[in-house]
Design a protein with these regions (language model features):
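Bacterial N-terminal signal peptides that target proteins for export
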Residues: 2-12
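C-terminal motif of bacterial Sec signal peptides marking the signal peptidase cleavage site
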Residues: 20-22
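Acidic, Gly/Ser/Thr-rich repeat motifs that build Ca2+-stabilized beta-propeller blades
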Residues: 24-29, 34-201, 249, 257-260, ...
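Surface-exposed loop and turn segments in beta-propeller and other repeat-based domains
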Residues: 92-106, 160-178, 219-240, 282-313
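Beta-propeller blade signature
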Residues: 142-153, 207-220, 274-275
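Secondary-structure boundary elements
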Residues: 184-190, 217-232, 251-257
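Repeat-solenoid scaffold signature
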Residues: 235-270
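Conserved blade-ending motifs and adjacent loop-strand segments that build the rim/top face
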Residues: 244, 355-375
Length: 397
């Protein structure tokens, strides 16, 4: 039995920090000018972390650091995007964003950059975005677009030439389980996209569509050569793996292995090694049960389906995760940190001889949507919901 360290992080804020947290943004339009954040936010120490705030946001969903810069770009579900220069504390807006189908779990989704385009500023680099797109007859689906990020001033950037390069197929009714997380292979030859089951379940076992799959594409969104179902034609030729439910984390580790983190039903959240041609079993098997308490056979009953590396019952409701590549947190290097929504926690995972173990859980007062590692090794964490804050975590002194 693994003994877990568990910490309660009391988020007691100084007056200066409370003032910073009160600086919100308008909820509509992509041309609103946010108030600047304080340039030197005051740190609060708690548990193993020292925390500073870098602004608050309107339903933040994803964040990415423009490689080689100090700017973190943050998507907001209603269809807006902001950025923070963490070296100065200044906040800025991004224009040129797509129309999104906002509602339920849908809206503006992930944001990603290419590491090979690292520079000292964020001007003139490729930006990838995902979002929920409306279709005919009350249908909708996830899409991925690509454009150029141009920053004309310290507080303003725009996305130019944005075009959709991939669409989830087919569009269906409902506003859940888009997934639409983005990851690039370490050599930057391939674009991987998590495509959720859209709460329709059975299509995740039907390889004639891309619901409940991870797709592998060229950087321009066309199907990559060598995919396992290429002979079946479009859209099956996009599929890398299937039998997924609702993936909210998609990351490569330092060895080049792709992992996904996904929501189970009632129980059965999963961390999976994503492998070519693997079927992860949803909805035929799960280590959880249906919301109406009907049982689902677990993975042990059907060995032809790929079992998770680790699962959680009760659920943690993951928002995202990141691998720890820096040395700032000492022997945590090579481990992973998960942002928990329902669990309101950061979950520390270790990798031991091919096994994944939960090493510790650090409780917060709010749902956590996103976590990423900065170039200096600090963790940047986004709280979920309206007014969700961006928190920078370093080891407590």
């Amino acid at each position: 039995m693994i003994m877990l360290k568990k910490y309660r992080l009391a988020l007691i804020l100084s007056p200066a920090t409370l003032a910073l947290a009160s600086c919100g943004y308008a909820t509509s339009g992509d041309s609103e000018t946010p108030s600047p954040a304080a340039s030197s936010p005051e740190a609060t120490q708690m548990g193993p972390f020292s925390m500073t705030e870098h602004g608050s946001f309107n339903e933040p969903w994803a964040a990415a650091i423009a490689p080689g810069s100090d700017r973190i770009f943050i998507t907001e579900k209603p269809g807006t995007m902001k950025f923070v220069d963490v070296s100065t504390g200044k906040l800025g807006t991004v224009t040129g964003l797509p129309d999104v189908d906002y509602g339920g779990q849908g809206g503006l989704g992930d944001v990603a950059f290419l590491e090979s385009e690292a520079g000292n500023d964020a001007t003139g680099r490729t930006i990838y975005l995902s979002w929920a797109e409306a279709g005919d007859n009350n249908t909708r689906g996830a899409v991925v677009g690509r454009g150029q990020l141009v920053c004309a001033a310290a507080d303003t950037c725009s996305v130019e030439g944005l075009e959709v390069i991939w669409r989830q197929a087919p569009k269906v009714t409902g506003r859940g389980h888009y997934s639409h997380r983005i990851a690039f292979s370490p050599d930057e030859k391939y674009l991987f996209v998590a495509s959720g089951d859209r709460q329709k379940m059975e299509p995740a076992q039907d390889a004639s569509n891309t619901l409940g799959t991870v797709v592998r594409l060229n950087l321009d969104g066309t199907p990559a050569a060598g995919n396992p179902l290429a002979a079946q034609g479009s859209p099956s030729d996009e599929i890398w793996s299937w039998g997924h439910r609702n993936i909210l984390g998609l990351q490569f580790d330092s060895s080049g292995q792709l992992w996904d983190l996904e929501h189970g039903p009632k129980g059965g959240d999963e961390l999976n090694r994503v492998e070519r041609g693997a079927n992860y079993g949803w909805p035929v098997v799960s280590d959880g049960i249906h919301y109406d308490n009907d049982n689902i056979p677990n993975h042990a009953t059907r060995p032809e389906f790929k079992a998770p590396a680790i699962g959680w019952t009760p659920v943690i409701a993951p928002g995202d995760f990141t691998f720890i590549n820096g040395a700032l947190f000492g022997d945590w290097k090579g481990d992973a940190i998960v942002a928990g929504l329902k669990s309101k926690a950061l979950i520390h995972l270790g990798f031991d001889g091919g096994k994944v173990v939960e090493k510790a859980r650090y409780d917060f007062d709010n749902r956590l949507r996103e976590v990423l590692e900065g170039p200096d090794g600090a963790f940047y964490v986004l709280e979920d919901g309206d007014g969700g804050r961006l928190l920078r975590l370093t080891p407590a002194s």
